[in-house]
Amino acid sequence: MLINFFSSIEVLFVIIKWILLLGYWWLITEVTIRILFKRRTVPSAMAWLLIIYVVPFIGAIIYLLLGELNLEKKRIKRSKIIWISALKKIKKLKNYKEIFTTKNSHIARSLFRLCKHRQGIGGVKSEKINILNDPDNVMQSVINDINLAKISIEMIFYIWHPGGWTNYVVEVLIKAANRGVKCRLILDSAGSKNFLKSIQVKIMRKSGIKIVEALNLNILQIFLRRMDLRQHRKMILIDNYIGYTGSMNMIDPKFFKKNRKIGEWIDIMIRMEGPVASAMRIIFSCDWEIETGENIFYAPYDTKKCNIIKKDNNYKTQVIPSGPGVSEGVIHQVLLTAIYSAKKILIMTTPYLVPSDDILHAICTASQRGVSVYIIIPKFIDSILVKWASRSFFSELLHAGVLIYQFEGGLLHTKSILVDDQLSLVGTVNLDMRSLWLNFEITLMVDNRNFGKKLKKIQTNYMSLSKVLHLKEWSKRPYWKRIIERFFYFFSPLL
């Protein structure tokens, strides 16, 4: 009897073993097929295959969580409907002919055409554009504009961190809401998680400020949506007339990540007046409706004010939103076209340098065909993974003649590109795969030499606070560092 019992247990264990083995192979086979049949770059596919075969079960789970661009079905359906509606709004905007640019420089012409074809809207004019590169000046300017707001204040931020200047912004927002100004905030659930749980948010909501938590982190949705898909835009809109965008989150650098020992974050923000704000607000209204279901679109820029923008010396701008469901891949196309458009000089600043193969080759080719190429990156960054992955690209860039400047004055967070002193791109997009293909981002393109000169002055100042990396010096680094670099290089398509 006892022998039969143990025999039955043994049979049961054998059955369980085979079930687990078959389940394991089914999972690996299923994930492998999904990787191979998804449209992705070869390096990305190879990196994922390595992960699931080196750490099979865990690797497969990681892929299901982070490897595919999944959104909830309801959100996908809502997004499509809203963006179709946005195209109709854009067509209405075309009736305001005075606000659109008709001529561009030879450097920018193809880029503006590309954006018009992909997004359905061409470049728009801006009456005034200022570059603000001092955080105190940025915050003071924002506070002044909020105090003068009469109709609406709308903001999108990835990070909203309390302390210092940010607390003053909260105070003036509450005052604005109390005097009848409509205030709407979209804050990313991950980047602003501490602020969203704070007492400040409760007070703001009581005063009438609407605050939406974008892409909510929910453990129940872990297999339905990528948790690392984030709302990475930084935008401020006031009265549908003033707009801000750039790389700066709603933070006071003196109070943000003080314990990381990497210095204060260095950013720029662009303040604009005029029709460009209407183009930016279409993006905000779509994001708001996707998150809340509320349609807040209203008439664009007041054409009665167009007596100024008819002049030829106004700024020609293009607002470029990017992210899932929003002209997918457009920002990658824009960056490639901008790099290939360079004839004399190309200056790029980015905190995270993990480019796609196409962008890497475009940068190297630009240098090899005689363009002076400068890349400014921070010497110290807040991500060990990105640090080593970035270093894996240095050799190829240096051999191509690209000058790499390592900024030592803090964490350089500015994302900017300047082409031949004429064409400028500033915004939230890092030179990494997450910004290029995953996150919701915004980029401002400006076709104006005076603006380019101002941006170049800031970039030149960054260079003065940087150390140039020389090929001879780089070639002497220890072999253990080279091994780590090559390891992270293989996984760079996933960062």
Swiss-Prot record:
Subcellular location: Cell membrane
GO biological-process terms attached to the record: cardiolipin biosynthetic process
Domain of life assignment: Bacteria
Entries under SUPFAM superfamilies matching the protein: Phospholipase D/nuclease
PROSITE patterns reported in the protein's UniProt record: PLD (PS50035)
The enzyme's E.C. designation: 2.7.8.-
Catalysed transformations (reactions): 2 a 1,2-diacyl-sn-glycero-3-phospho-(1'-sn-glycerol) = a cardiolipin + glycerol
Function as written in the Swiss-Prot or TrEMBL entry: Catalyzes the reversible phosphatidyl group transfer from one phosphatidylglycerol molecule to another to form cardiolipin (CL) (diphosphatidylglycerol) and glycerol.
Name by which UniProt lists this protein: Cardiolipin synthase A
